[in-house]
Design a protein with these regions (language model features):
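Hydrophobic transmembrane alpha-helices and immediately adjacent juxtamembrane helices
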Residues: 2-18, 22-366
């Protein structure tokens, strides 16, 4: 025989309070006759009854794989959202979308004026303009992804509270916005490299996997930044200082390989993820970097001494600047840079996704 479900009213009556005291007043009644149910027990009973009839909490966190499938189904929404935000970002400016390219160009120009012409940090670095612009554009991609995602959850509270969707789609869409801007920056970077004498080679194709690894890394740190920004009120105040420090230790303005003779210092700086993606992109697009990197040619003490003596002088000919290739390499093994970059990308993606997913039901509350 099939088992019939007890009606909700019958269950509540079965769980009435065991209190047998009498109520004051004429015609006294036992509280057991009234059937009082403890509030906690009543809530638990209602939850059990709802589950039996197929009802589930609206803000229940899905499993990891179910969450990934939800994100994949919304991939077109994220692409459309990113494109629309990119178009709307500069609608009120007279130059419009040109600011997407002008902003990193102006930053690179300021850095070149200060560090290249005034402080002469460019000594010993062939094609310093191309070196600097490449570093600024690549670092700017990660920096903007980190900063923009830090406020995405608080800026989208109305959307989060009104609709049910995987919250990770918001920071992912913002990373897509920065990726679209990075592609525009690359379209500007290539003519600059050609004008500064860099040849077109098959090595340029290596910039594609370098950009892909950096994008994966940015997704991970974007998810991490999104949760921290939504739960730590002072996080947005700390970000400018963190980003400025990260800029100065990532080799954007100088060559890490020649900054110190201490192996541990150089290796630590080179294994910084931002520095890795910058180095991989420079080595892919700039022949001057591949040919002048210390250790790229057999060690020659005499030529290395000439580089240390003349290559750092202001206005030194490029033939002296490229002699650094004959010096010993100090730091991490350049042949392993791709492995390090891939490791950082996977680590950031897995850790960032798990960290964000754990708080899926908390976004939009407060």
């Amino acid at each position: 025989m099939s088992q019939t479900k007890t009606p909700l009213r019958g269950r509540l009556a079965a769980r009435r309070s065991p209190d047998s005291g009498r109520l004051a007043g004429p015609g006294s009644l036992l509280t057991s006759d009234v059937g009082v149910v403890a509030p906690d027990a009543e809530g638990q009973l209602l939850a059990e009854y709802a589950l039996e009839h197929g009802l589930r909490p609206s803000a229940q966190r899905p499993s990891v794989w179910a969450y990934i499938r939800q994100l994949w189904r919304r991939r077109y929404f994220m692409i459309s959202f990113a494109t629309a935000r990119n178009v709307a970002m500069y609608t009120e400016a007279k130059l419009g979308q040109l600011w997407q390219v002008l902003t990193p160009l102006l930053n690179a120009g300021v850095y070149f004026l200060i560090f290249g012409l005034l402080l002469h940090i460019n000594r010993g670095i062939p094609n310093y303009l191309g070196f600097l612009v490449t570093g600024v554009f690549v670092f700017n991609f990660t920096q903007r992804a980190f900063i923009s995602t830090s406020s995405v959850m608080t800026d989208s509270l109305q959307l989060i509270r009104a609709l049910q969707f995987p919250r990770a789609s918001l920071p992912l869409a913002y990373v897509m916005i920065e990726l679209q801007q990075m592609l525009l920056a690359v379209a500007v970077l290539i003519p600059i490299l050609l004008l500064t004498g860099e040849p077109v080679t098959w090595y340029w194709l290596l910039a594609i996997p370098a950009l892909l690894l950096q994008t994966i890394f940015n997704v991970g740190v974007g998810l991490l930044s999104a949760r921290l920004g939504s739960q730590v009120n002072d996080f947005s105040q700390l970000l400018p200082f963190l980003m400025r420090t990260w800029l100065y230790v990532s080799g954007v303005l100088f060559s890490i390989a020649t900054v110190s003779s201490n192996f541990k210092v150089v290796a630590l700086l080179e294994l910084n993820p931002a520095a890795l993606y910058i180095t991989l992109t420079r080595n892919a697009l700039m022949a001057t970097q591949r040919e002048s990197a210390p250790g790229s040619k057999p060690y020659n003490k005499a030529l290395c001494n000439i580089w240390h003596t003349l290559g750092h002088k202001k206005g030194a000919p490029e033939k002296y600047q490229t002699l650094s290739a004959y010096c010993h390499y100090v730091g991490a093994n350049p042949a392993h840079f791709w492995y390090y970059a891939a490791g950082w990308a996977v680590l950031a993606l897995v850790a960032g996704f798990w960290f964000f997913w754990r708080a899926e039901t908390r976004y939009g509350r407060g």
